[in-house]
Amino acid sequence: WSFVFAVLMGLAIVIAANRFFREGNEDLINWVSVMAFIGYGLMCTNFIRLVDIIPERAMYFVEAEPEMQKAMLAANPLPLDPTSILTFGFVGFWVLVINFVSKDKGDFPGYLSILGMLVGVLHIFVALGNLLQMQVLISIAAGLGGIVLGPIWLFWFGVLLKKERYP
């Protein structure tokens, strides 16, 4: 459930970032924000399925007769986003674009822009890793982006947005 919570917090960041970066780039920021909403929404759905539906199915599978187990294996539902383009790809593109746009904002730290662009690329690595069937890209993205740099960027960006809103 922690991933579901993190994704819901990501949706809140999209709203705040949209307001922060909209001036001078309204159409672009609105467009990538919609992409982020789609990505985070699908991520949330996938994570809920992982923690709720799949364990329940596993319980039924273990208790089922062999014929039913075969049927359950054959009827395994397809993931909502098997390539991760709509989830990690869309969110990564949003992170990349808002941080690229932030370079032109005088009150936005340059190091945060660079860190954010790297985080965006690492999100996109998940989709590329799935498309190219290269587990190493997914592992790099999960380790470096998901555990280390992503949380640092989100925290720093959140502090900056809070300062801008409540100086």
Where are these regions (language model features)?
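Hydrophobic, aromatic-enriched alpha-helical segments typical of multi-pass transmembrane helices
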Residues: 1-167
